[in-house]
Structures are given as C-alpha cells and as structure tokens.
Amino acid sequence: MKMKKLTLAIAAIALCAAAAAQTTPEEFQTRYDRLVRNLGYDGVGVETLLDRWEEAFPDDAAVPKARFNYYFTKSQRSEVLPKPGQRRFLGNAPTLTLKDSDGGDVNYFEEYFYDEELFGEAMKVLDAQIAAHPDELRWHYLKITALSAFEKESPDMAAAELRQLIAHDASAHPAWTLDGESAGTEIFQQGVGEYCASFFGIGTDAGYEYFREISELMTKRFPRNPVFIDNIGSYWLVAKDNEKQAVKFYKKALKIDPQDEAATRNLKIIERRQAQAKAKKK
C-alpha cells in the first residue's frame, strides 16, 4: 500500500513537471483530469498544477472551478456517527445499522464536517467569479450547493443566496449563461427547482420552510410554472399534514397543466389515504 502511494506521488510530481511545458488549456485540462482520477481533487500536486495553469492561461474558467474543488474537498472530513431514532439523515439512508444494548436498531450515517478556513478559501474563489461574471449560473450554483452542504440541517445561507439569485433575475432580467453557454429562463427555473427539491430532501423543519419560501417566490415570478405550485402542495401535505390545503394547490397546478404528473399522483395518494381513513371508521 505504501509503495502504491509513493508511486502515485511520484507520478503526480512528474505530471506537474510536464505541465510546465504545456502550451494549451486543453493540455492542462488533460493533465489535471489524470491527476484527479489518480489522487482526487485535493491530491498531491494539484495545487501546483493549478498555479501553473492559471499563470499560463489566467482567463481559463476551468482553473477557478478546479481551485474551488481543491479547497472544498480539502476542507472536508467525514465520520460515520449514530443517529438514534432517525431513519434518514439529510435525505440519506443509513450507512449501517447496529443493535444497542436493548436489542434495538441504531442507524449510523456518514456526516461531513468542514475546516472553516479552507471552506472560506473555497468561497473566496466563487465570490471572485460571481463578482466578475454575475450572469454565469455555474458559480452561483456551486456556491449554493457548497453552503447547503456546510450548513446541513438548516441551510440558512444557501437559501439566502438563492433568494438573491431570484431577486437578481426579477430586477435585472440577466442574460444567464451556464458553463459559458446561453441559458434561457427555463434552465434558470429548472436550477432553482432542483434546489427546492434539495431543501425538501433534507427532511428538517428548516429545510421544509425554505422549500416553501423559495417555491412561493418562484410562483410569483413564474405563475405559469406548475412545478413550484406542486411544491407548495407538497409542503402542506408532508410538512404540515394538511391534505385540504395540499389539494387546493395540486388542483391549481392541474388547471395550468392538466398533464401534471406530480399533481395527479399526489391527489391519488390523498384520495387513497382518505378512503382508508373512512374504511377504518366503519
């Protein structure tokens, strides 16, 4: 095992030395991809390669993305910890289940922790890119994703960042891009929708409230998009166990799109639950 690590480290040094002779961004990218495959985003030699890449091609957007990945990955450590009474943690199934002294099941989950200084360096990279390229969605998405991972059960900063993004869209009507390509309003809505789903998947009170709040903002911004109306219905159904309110929003979504699968499926679930409840009373 030690010999394998030594071999990989020597290979990393060789790759970085070769990088000094690279003449195109594509060649740097190839060297970087090979290094990451072997050693990971924060492996030996990655930072040196990025320094040389940035020096040779300071405007290559691949460099800050790679540098963010370097700091973000380096800031992480994980532990498998017991979470008594929890079936899921941050939307994830248990890594393993063991018995306690009374014979009961105790679920263990992998949980990530972050070095604040290194995480801060990752955020500096993204903030600089957002300031320089405010209409490039990738930088915003990376920041929201990282903040949500850092905050875990209560994604306060991630939600605030998402609110700012929606406000910017409403006030400035920017010509969004995603990875340098033109991104229309549908792509923007899809991206926000994915973060709503992420907040919902956290499964905490804070996650549900941000799921509702962002969905309501997007419903005001895009009233003809049934996805966010469905979201509000799901908030009432799952977080508040209020079927009457949920039905109201699902039916509203179906008026906009009669083929809305989410609304149709959830209304059937509610109907089945109500029928079962009536049957029990008989």
Regions found by a protein language model. Give the residues of each.
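TPR alpha-solenoid repeat register
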Residues: 63, 139, 174-175, 191, ...
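N-terminal leader/linker segments that initiate helical-solenoid repeat arrays
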Residues: 20-109
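Residue-level recognition of tetratricopeptide repeat
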Residues: 69, 145-147, 197, 234-235, ...
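Alpha-helical adaptor scaffolds
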Residues: 178-238
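Short coil/linker segments at helix-helix boundaries
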Residues: 70-128, 132, 149-189, 193-195, ...
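Short coil turns that delineate tetratricopeptide repeat
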Residues: 58-61, 131-135, 170-171, 222-224, ...
